[in-house]
């Protein structure tokens, strides 16, 4: 169906542009962007995500460093390792793959990553800049915005260029998607309603929306009754079920024919998240050279 949004195709366009930009940057600086990925433990899903990030990074000319640590590592020891990467001038950007083991203080770890290398956009300084309205999606800003939120916004603007006044219902309040995306949509002059698992009358709220973003983490939770024929549906859910199959928060098979546009899972927002992670990494590289190379 032509109303199904091909996130992989959109992501590939971004990656091709980044590949050309990296080639130009390398000719100017004789260096390449480098992304450090800190992975604690051997969570199968995390390993798959990390491999995809590394594969796409190498495809466009971004070097990577994978730091794989044992689940027995203590919070302070992990912070020490992160500080080493903070002070490594070859590292442009850094992410800590989530989730972390329960024994590790996630907030301390995310705060330990230098805000200037925080290409996931999770450092409290970057979070504060976004929600205070100080920064926007401009690549001239020296702060970072969470990649999934950027990917969602890019998809939404592709299919609804004039967002001013649109009613967007964001279902989910995480720091990774719901909160940052809501902040970005407010900057686009949308009327944003944030819902979550405790929201009453969720169906009637979503039904009135122009755009619905599903990021609630509940497989196939949103059925056709939640949407109107003009709805644009962005499904951010990644839910693993039997046989390692991945499904979204939206009942895709029964919803796709009832709405204007919809993203599939997989193949929707996932590839866009990786594309914007790598875009943030290139931005971090340019920021680190800007004072001496005038990039």
Swiss-Prot record:
Keyword Nuclease appears in the UniProt entry: no
Catalysed transformations (reactions): (6R)-5,10-methylene-5,6,7,8-tetrahydrofolate + NADP(+) = (6R)-5,10-methenyltetrahydrofolate + NADPH; (6R)-5,10-methenyltetrahydrofolate + H2O = (6R)-10-formyltetrahydrofolate + H(+)
GO molecular-function terms, A-Z: methenyltetrahydrofolate cyclohydrolase activity; methylenetetrahydrofolate dehydrogenase (NADP+) activity
InterPro entries per UniProt: Aminoacid_DH-like_N_sf, NAD(P)-bd_dom_sf, THF_DH/CycHdrlase, THF_DH/CycHdrlase_cat_dom, THF_DH/CycHdrlase_CS, THF_DH/CycHdrlase_NAD-bd_dom
GO CC annotation terms, alphabetical: cytosol
Single GO BP term: methionine biosynthetic process
Xref: SUPFAM superfamilies: Aminoacid dehydrogenase-like, N-terminal domain (SSF53223), NAD(P)-binding Rossmann-fold domains (SSF51735)
EC number(s) per entry: 1.5.1.5, 3.5.4.9
Keywords: Amino-acid biosynthesis, Histidine biosynthesis, Hydrolase, Methionine biosynthesis, Multifunctional enzyme, NADP, One-carbon metabolism, Oxidoreductase, Purine biosynthesis
Keyword NADP: yes
Binding positions for NADP(+) per the UniProt entry: 172-174, 197, 238
Pathway: One-carbon metabolism; tetrahydrofolate interconversion
Record note on quaternary structure: Homodimer.
Role played: Catalyzes the oxidation of 5,10-methylenetetrahydrofolate to 5,10-methenyltetrahydrofolate and then the hydrolysis of 5,10-methenyltetrahydrofolate to 10-formyltetrahydrofolate.
PANTHER family xrefs: C-1-TETRAHYDROFOLATE SYNTHASE, CYTOPLASMIC (PTHR48099:SF5), C-1-TETRAHYDROFOLATE SYNTHASE, CYTOPLASMIC-RELATED (PTHR48099)
Family of the protein in this entry: Belongs to the tetrahydrofolate dehydrogenase/cyclohydrolase family.
Name of the molecule in the record: Bifunctional protein FolD
Organism of this sequence: Rickettsia akari (strain Hartford)
């Amino acid at each position: 169906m032509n109303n199904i949004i091909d996130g992989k195709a959109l992501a590939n366009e971004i990656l091709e542009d980044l590949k050309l930009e990296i080639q130009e940057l390398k000719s100017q600086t004789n260096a390449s962007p480098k992304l450090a990925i800190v992975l604690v433990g051997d969570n199968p899903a995390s390993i798959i995500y990390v491999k995809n990030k590394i594969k796409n990074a190498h495809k466009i000319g971004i070097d990577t460093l994978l730091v794989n640590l044992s689940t027995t590592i203590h919070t302070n020891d992990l912070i020490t390792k992160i500080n080493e990467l903070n002070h490594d001038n070859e590292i442009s950007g850094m992410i800590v793959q989530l989730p972390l083991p329960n024994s590790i203080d996630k907030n301390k770890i995310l705060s330990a990553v230098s805000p200037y290398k925080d290409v996931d956009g999770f450092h409290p300084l970057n979070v504060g800049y976004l929600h205070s309205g100080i920064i926007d999606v401009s690549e001239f800003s020296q702060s970072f915005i969470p990649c999934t939120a950027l990917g969602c916004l890019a998809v939404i603007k592709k299919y609804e260029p004039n967002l001013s006044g649109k009613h967007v219902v964001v279902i989910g309040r995480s720091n990774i998607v719901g909160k940052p995306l809501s902040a970005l949509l407010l900057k686009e002059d949308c009327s944003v309603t944030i819902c979550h698992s405790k929201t009453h009358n969720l169906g009637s709220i979503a039904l009135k929306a122009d755009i619905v973003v599903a990021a609630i983490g509940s497989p196939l939770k949103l059925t056709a009754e939640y949407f109107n024929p003009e709805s644009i549906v962005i499904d951010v859910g990644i839910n693993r079920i039997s046989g390692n199959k991945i499904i979204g928060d939206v009942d895709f098979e029964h919803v796709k024919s009832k709405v204007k546009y919809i993203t599939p899972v997989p193949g929707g927002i996932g590839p866009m998240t990786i594309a914007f992670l790598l875009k943030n990494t290139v931005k971090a590289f340019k920021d680190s050279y800007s004072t001496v190379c005038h990039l």
